[in-house]
Amino acid sequence: MPLTFSVWQALLNNFVVERAAFTGAEIGMLQSLREVPGFLAFTAVFVLLVVREQRFALGSLLVMSVGVALTPFFPSTYGLYATTVVMSMGFHYFETINKSLTLQWIEKTQTPHFMGKAMAVKAAGALLAYSSIWLLMEWVGFGFTAMYLLAGGIGVVITLALWVAFPHFPEGAVQHKK
């Protein structure tokens, strides 16, 4: 997830100014809309009434990746607002469920160590994303469309691979659905 999200975030301000002629007002609205799904992440508990956590997490990753891949195809104010909200829904729901699953599946004694390693992997993914942007745009000549498609496509492929590789883990804690 850090790879896909980091590409989206790193390219966003330049993309919206160059392709959609955003001013500070539109960028401010875009960033505000990006946070709306974060405020609504509590609604995950309602989704969990009908969808298992693992599937919900993978579905959220898929939604985020598709939102990133669609970004360059809607270089208008409302198009970018829409793709940003789609991407952000996936991002915030995944972050919410990811913490829950980690705490369920990892032994309590190993949790701090595991979460530290996970943060290190996220940071490495972000650094890989930033260096890839520079390399591919500066040296290979990729444009915004290619970069967003590549990042979103990689996210989709990784998510589908995870879906196949890990069909279903048993739930570590029984979730009460009352």
Predicted regions and their residues:
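Transmembrane alpha-helix termini and helix-breaking/packing motifs in multi-pass membrane transporters
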Residues: E18-R19, F42-V50, L127-Y148
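Glycine-rich segments within core transmembrane alpha-helices of 12-TM secondary carriers
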Residues: H113-S131
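C-terminal membrane-cytosol helix-exit motif in multi-pass small-molecule transporters
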Residues: I133, G152-G172
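Helix-loop boundary and gating motifs at the non-cytosolic
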Residues: M1-G38
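Cytoplasmic membrane-interface "Motif A"-like loop-to-helix N-cap segments
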Residues: L49-L61
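C-terminal ends and interior cores of transmembrane alpha-helices
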Residues: L62-P75
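Hydrophobic core of transmembrane alpha-helices in multi-pass small-molecule transporters
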Residues: G67, Y78-F94
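Intracellular juxtamembrane helix-capping segments at the cytosolic ends
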Residues: Y93-I106
